[in-house]
């Protein structure tokens, strides 16, 4: 909730950050991701009418704005690129939806080619696995997409929904960017109220 997107210079010896510079007044920047070749930066603005901005990273570290498109929902909180770099995946927390944005040749973004709305009963307010005396609660008042990413093969896409206690799974058409729900379409969390947020793949890509 600061002024926007900042750039820093990193001291390679000490790790210290310096030369703080405001490069965009994009409100409530919630997530950043960089293309595999390091030439493009993507930033999500977690606002009601969510947007994603694309920036070209110049050799001197300066950013050049490419464009801005709708995130496909409200409150985008997570961005990730497919392994081939052709699509940007977006998780919209407030609306509980996910979207697929095509990446153009110059790194700019096109409007969403696919969007899916999470639906289902809200999960338990308190985690069933919480230790005795815990005050832990989760945002289980409806769907809240929290993370989205493709597996290392680029054939499948997974997304977590904190509010519904689910991990959704899709088949990805890498040419069109369309997502098709797998069978089953989702996996329930390990226990009620667990509120899945993030995941990682094994190095071999055969586990999550």
Residue ranges and their predicted role:
Residues 1, 46-47, 93, 103, ...:
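Short loop/turn segments immediately following the C-termini of beta-strands
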Residues 5, 49-52, 96-99, 165-167:
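Structural signal for beta-propeller blades
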Residues 9-15, 55-62, 100-110, 170-179:
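Short loop/turn segments immediately following beta-strands, especially the blade-tip
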Residues 28-30, 75, 144, 195:
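Beta-rich catalytic cores
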Residues 36-38, 83-84, 152-153, 203-205:
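Residue-level detector of Asp-centered blade-edge/turn motifs that repeat once per structural unit
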Residues 62-147:
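Asp-box/WD-like beta-propeller blade repeats and closely related beta-sheet repeat scaffolds
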């Amino acid at each position: 909730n600061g002024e926007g997107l900042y750039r820093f210079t990193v001291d390679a010896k000490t790790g210290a950050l310096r030369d703080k510079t405001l490069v965009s007044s994009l409100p409530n920047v919630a997530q950043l991701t960089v293309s595999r070749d390091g030439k493009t930066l993507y930033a999500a603005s977690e606002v009601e009418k969510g947007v994603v901005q694309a920036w070209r990273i110049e050799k001197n570290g300066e950013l050049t704005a490419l464009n801005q498109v709708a995130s496909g929902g409200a409150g985008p909180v997570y961005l990730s690129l497919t392994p081939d770099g052709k699509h940007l995946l977006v998780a919209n927390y407030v609306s509980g939806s996910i979207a697929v944005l095509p990446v153009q040749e110059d790194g700019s973004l096109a409007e969403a080619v696919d969007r899916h709305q999470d639906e289902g009963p809200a999960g338990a307010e308190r985690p069933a696995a919480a230790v005795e005396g815990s005050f832990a609660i989760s945002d289980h008042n409806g769907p809240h997409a929290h993370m989205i990413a493709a597996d290392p093969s680029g054939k499948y896409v997974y997304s977590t929904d904190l509010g519904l206690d689910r991990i959704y799974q899709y088949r990805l058409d890498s040419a069109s960017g369309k997502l098709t729900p797998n069978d089953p379409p989702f996996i329930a969390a390990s226990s009620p109220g667990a509120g899945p947020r993030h995941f990682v793949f094994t190095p071999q890509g055969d586990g999550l």
